[in-house]
């Protein structure tokens, strides 16, 4: 064998290294090809298992723009949507945009449960409804809009309230539930029934210009509503859209986000391995921002999904759990005032017409509402922001200087609730001639002055 020089040896080593790199590249390409073929075969098997029936040409054209998005999941994901059944509880500010986008996306069957009717005051935010359909059931109004939007989607309506008597029967038909309600008692009912049936919940809420959403009981490994809130909020802390107001696009954005999370759940974006409990929070003012917070996991002590659950299907169905009592409620039939401290709008109207007695009318609505409309001569003392937080011995500082504790005071608000609390506070402070006007400005508009704006 001829001895090689050092230079020749180096050349030979370089040649062998190049050949080795080429062999590695060929092997790697073969591995990629094998994995790709296996993936295609697996996807085809999944596709066939999801839905054997192919999409029509119109469906390809209708859903094509979403199917080509890489993270969506292509044709198989669309077939998953088409084979899915979802229930939307509430066709209001959250449910309206969620229903529209989920219908447009091609969900196979959508159930809507809502016993309320469309009102003019709904239309600025509940955009699935039309002016021409004011007065009809919201679920039927939504169904009409959805059938016009996408005839491929089956829509089932339930013009009733969700109760312990019908919840299991209705929810059991569906793969997933969207909680678009605004009442704590219904939220707890939806949560308990879904946990006991093994259903995932997409839950949203919104008020004024803020909202939030989360996923509950994900695949029976994620936390439920009771994990987050084992105790119900105080009834006095709950503000409705009619009392607190709501900006349409703000709550609509939350509803759209709920639709997006629903699509991700149905198409398999989330798995038991990658799912992390979260709360997404949106605020429109002063600058729009969406923040996502990591939430605590499923709680072993939870009464419905924990290690030793106390709540059972039988308990819910037979009424052993009183959701209204658990959440508490304000008893409007038993006002906090004696009858002698209250007058009707008719009595106050007669007093104005007679002009027989001087008095001061105190309007305790928030400043923004007072500026919308008010009765002539009334003064504004914001109950939620100012009046309710004032010590009794300092109330005289809020009132005009010429008012004495012997003067006649009448207190009014929008619906007659805050005015009762404000009147009681005035009486406690020594203003014994203070009286509440029953039913507030809403009642004034209905019974005395039809031209007075209701909002």
From Swiss-Prot:
This is Adenylyltransferase and sulfurtransferase UBA4. PANTHER family: ADENYLYLTRANSFERASE AND SULFURTRANSFERASE MOCS3, UBIQUITIN-ACTIVATING ENZYME E1. It is found in: Cytoplasm, Cytosol. The gene is UBA4. The keyword 4Fe-4S does not apply. In the N-terminal section; belongs to the HesA/MoeB/ThiF family. UBA4 subfamily. Pfam families: Rhodanese, ThiF. GO terms for cellular component: cytosol. It comes from Lodderomyces elongisporus (strain ATCC 11503 / CBS 2605 / JCM 1781 / NBRC 1676 / NRRL YB-4239). Binds 1 zinc ion per subunit.
């Amino acid at each position: 064998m001829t001895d090689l020089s050092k230079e020749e040896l180096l050349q030979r080593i370089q040649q062998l290294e190049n050949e080795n790199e080429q062999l590695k590249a060929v092997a790697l390409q073969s591995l990629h090809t094998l994995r790709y073929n296996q993936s295609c075969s697996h996807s085809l098997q999944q596709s066939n298992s999801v839905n054997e029936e192919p999409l029509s040409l119109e469906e390809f054209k209708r859903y094509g723009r979403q199917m080509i998005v890489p993270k969506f999941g292509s044709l198989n994901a669309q077939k998953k949507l088409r084979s899915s059944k979802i229930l939307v509880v509430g066709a209001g500010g959250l449910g309206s945009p969620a229903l529209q986008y989920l219908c447009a996306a091609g969900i196979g069957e959508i159930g809507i449960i809502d016993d309320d009717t469309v009102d003019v005051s709904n239309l600025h935010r509940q955009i699935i409804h039309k002016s021409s359909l004011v007065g009809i059931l919201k679920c039927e109004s939504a169904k009409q809009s959805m059938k016009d939007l996408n005839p491929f989607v089956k829509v089932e309506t339930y013009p009733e309230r969700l109760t312990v008597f019908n919840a299991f029967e209705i929810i059991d038909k569906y793969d997933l539930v969207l909680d678009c309600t605004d009442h704590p008692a219904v939220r707890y009912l939806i949560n308990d029934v879904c946990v006991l049936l093994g259903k995932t919940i997409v839950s949203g809420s919104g008020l004024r210009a803020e909202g939030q959403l989360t996923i509950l009981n994900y695949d029976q490994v994620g936390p439920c509503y009771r994990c987050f809130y084992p105790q119900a909020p105080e009834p006095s802390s709950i503000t409705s859209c009619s009392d607190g107001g709501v900006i349409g696009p703000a709550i609509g954005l939350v509803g759209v986000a709920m639709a997006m999370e629903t699509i991700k759940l149905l198409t398999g974006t989330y798995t038991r391995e990658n799912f992390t409990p979260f709360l997404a929070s949106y605020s429109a003012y002063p600058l729009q921002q969406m923040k996502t917070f990591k939430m605590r996991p499923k709680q072993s002590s939870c009464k419905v999904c924990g290690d030793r659950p106390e709540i059972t299907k039988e308990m819910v169905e037979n009424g052993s759990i009183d959701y209204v009592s658990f959440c508490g409620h304000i008893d409007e039939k038993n006002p906090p005032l004696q009858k002698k401290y209250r007058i009707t709008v008719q009595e106050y109207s007669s007093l104005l017409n007679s002009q027989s007695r001087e008095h001061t009318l105190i309007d305790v609505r928030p400043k923004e509402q007072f500026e919308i409309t008010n009765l002539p001569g009334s003064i504004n003392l914001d109950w939620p922001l100012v009046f309710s937080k004032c010590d009794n011995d300092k109330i005289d500082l809020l009132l005009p200087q010429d008012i004495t504790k012997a003067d006649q005071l009448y207190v009014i608000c929008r619906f007659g609730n805050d005015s009762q609390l404000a009147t009681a506070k005035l009486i406690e402070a020594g203003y014994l001639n203070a009286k509440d006007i029953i039913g507030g400005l809403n009642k004034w508009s209905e019974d005395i002055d039809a031209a007075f704006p209701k909002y």
